[in-house]
């Protein structure tokens, strides 16, 4: 019985080939879009390296400051001094990290031009986010306090800038300053906007 139904349906579909194609294409395309959107959302908000502790992380990117006279300021432009003194000293958070959104920086080596994403962070950054280190480790709070010119790079940067050789102890020029590489991590997706970068250096 069921086999007969399939034969009848198949003959009907072949009788109107154009409409059959349009219908099947529409259904397939809709399912494809839904799969892509679902995958995008899962990749953006799901627990993936380095954001494996999202249920314990609160990200603050904008502040609202009010004055006794009724003045208000809303924006991200808060100094590191303010964050370090007043936010880091809060009792409720277990850990506090301070950093900026990544910015693009152009550097050169052997007449080759490289365009990398650069991010400034403190030492706690490496304790909060769960990066997978291929080589070395992240810099510490001591490195930040001593303004040590050290850097952590991605595997992609190591491949491009150091020809995929061991990068530990090597120097990478960022702007007019040389930074010693102390760690190499797996590449981070741009969708992970807060931890994302190609190169991380101590915030000063």
Specify the residue positions occupied by each region the protein language model found:
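Mid-to-C-terminal secondary-structure elements
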Residues: 124-138, 149-204
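A short amphipathic helical element positioned immediately N-terminal to and/or at the very start
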Residues: 5-14, 82-86
């Amino acid at each position: 019985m069921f086999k007969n139904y399939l034969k009848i349906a198949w003959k009907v579909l072949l009788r109107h080939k154009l409409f059959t194609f349009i219908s099947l294409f529409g259904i397939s395309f809709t399912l494809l879009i839904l799969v892509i959107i679902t995958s995008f959302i899962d990749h953006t908000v799901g627990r993936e390296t380095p954001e494996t502790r999202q249920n314990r992380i609160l990200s603050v990117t904008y502040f609202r400051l009010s004055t006794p006279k009724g003045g208000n300021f809303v924006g991200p432009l808060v100094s590191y001094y303010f964050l370090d003194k007043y936010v880091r000293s809060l009792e409720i958070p277990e850990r506090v990290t301070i950093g900026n959104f990544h910015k693009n920086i152009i550097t050169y080596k052997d007449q080759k031009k490289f365009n990398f994403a650069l991010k400034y962070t403190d030492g706690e950054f490496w304790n909060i986010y769960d990066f997978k280190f291929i080589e070395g480790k992240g810099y510490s709070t001591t490195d930040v306090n001593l303004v040590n010119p050290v850097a952590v790079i991605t595997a992609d940067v190591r491949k491009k800038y150091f020809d995929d050789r061991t990068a530990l102890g090597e120097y990478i020029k960022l702007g007019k300053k040389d930074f010693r590489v102390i760690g190499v991590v797996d590449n981070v997706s741009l969708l992970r906007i807060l931890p994302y970068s190609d190169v991380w250096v101590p915030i000063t």
